[in-house]
Amino acid sequence: IACIDDYPGEVSANLLLDRIMGADVVLKKDDGRPEEVQYRELMDRLCKEYESVGEKVYQIPMGGSNLLGMCGYFECAQELTQQSRKNGLKAPKLVCAVGSLGTYMGLYCGLQEADSELCLTGIAISPFGEAKEQRLEEYYAQICSAIGMQKREKAAFHIETAYTRGGYNNPCREVRNAIYLMARQEGILLDPCYTGKAFAGLLDMISEGKIKKGETVIFLHTGGTPGLNTPCHRAEFESELRDGIQVLGERYEKLG
């Protein structure tokens, strides 16, 4: 596992799972250059190191956004289309978090190929600039070429960019409130970086009238719950939730 990041001071959240599974983790301190440049250099160096001792290396990019990962969500979109038709849903909206773009593009192409009635909306969880717009087009062409699908001249990508709330993985009260709502109403855990931020954006879209009362919405949960234990987020959760914890003393336990 290779990341451009500082050591958080403890083995927690994703780092804990990585190490439990036996993965090596390499963290490189940010040197101020574009993160993609640093990441590419780090991955190239690590691949050469492993190959030099006889290892065979398969490189998975950040977010799993390669052709194989995108094809997984291509199939997901087709399965959702089948389920939607089976249940007679009327023009349902499909909403997902958008980070490294692979999930969104796989879904987009899968819906196009299935001539689906689902309308896809992505909610960006980090600033969305020209580089990502260009990468969308590149991923679109890549999938179309790989599966032999007709590439549309003007693809209608719909990604909401107004709900990034200060940037990638930024602790935010509105996101935590969205996490509390989903957990307490549905018993489903969201994470503060991806699904929680996307769900908070979805709630804003409803309050702003972008999604109307009576419309059917499918919110796609893409995982990430270990992020609840990331130190910066856990500290905020603890400060907000501590008042609901009672510690009973020895006298009470004896009377009981």
Whereabouts are the PLM-identified features?
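Short beta-strand-loop elements within alpha/beta enzyme cores
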Residues: 55-59, 97, 191
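Active-site-adjacent helical/loop segments in soluble small-molecule enzymes
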Residues: 154-213
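Short beta-strand segments
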Residues: 2-4, 28-29, 60-63, 97-98, ...
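Small/polar-residue-rich loop-to-helix segments that shape phosphate-bearing ligand pockets
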Residues: 4-87, 150, 155-173, 177-178
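Residue-level signal for alpha-helix termini/capping positions
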Residues: 51, 85, 112, 184, ...
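Alpha-helix C-terminal capping segments
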Residues: 20, 108-115, 201-210
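Glycine-rich phosphate/pyrophosphate-binding loop at beta-loop-alpha junctions
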Residues: 70-158, 220-256
